[in-house]
């Protein structure tokens, strides 16, 4: 990690994390965040519009805003400001998918930072920025040939690999471990003893809970917003009902509870979340993805993280919850570590007279 005291050697760069529905960006010098911005644009816009124009425009605005901010707040002449200006953009997430800027193929697990950095690609998009852009690859697990009878071992990620590198670098996890990322999708990522990404397992649970809240007969029984707190007795009741009757029946039980005037909407949502947690956790334990000897680091929506931690601790699986600030720090650390390694490799190639890989 760069020394905080010697700022002359710290890289100033723009970091980007693009998801399905939004994009986050940070201007950093070394390990310090100078500014952060966001945009409600993601790769879903490309899929919907069948054009990357909105993604390109959002990136152009974010990068331009950072560059303008530096020039505005500094009274130093431009000729003396060179070392304080961003030298490149490093981006992870769906930006490296076919719906992003350019496709960077998934790497086959197991992989660590060395393999990820070696496969990252430098690209140029003059219509967006004159800065070089580093696209970080995602990771896939399972056999190369996907078939219906091996689909249970197949999974993909984009962005979480960078988060995992940061978590390990900062000591938030001690491999072998599992990172549980809870958002629209719930993803369990296994890290081996060397800290490499070994495999992952993703479910649609987050989206299904949201769909139940807004698109099913359960909508009137549940709050419109996502859970802000979990009513633990109701969550545990939902877990028990799922184990007794299955997920679909447990979900319909929310409607029955409403008809019987049992519980507030927020409590019934805790019941539903408990059913999904039990369904997923039991499957992961059965596959030995989760086990007593594996530390679990939980990131994502705070209420869901609290629900999962409670459920895991009840099964004697050690689990800790990372705050949103810690999660952001880990993601940015992962981005920075990968970028610094890529810049070192780029400099080495330049000294040898080789041309860096570029689209």
Indicate where each model-derived feature is located.
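Adenine-nucleotide phosphate-binding core of ATP-dependent small-molecule kinases
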Residues: 240-283
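Short glycine-rich, Thr/Ser-proximal phosphate-binding strand/loop in the N-terminal lobe
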Residues: 13-54, 321
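Glycine-rich phosphate-binding/hydrolytic loop that grips phosphoryl groups
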Residues: 310, 322-345
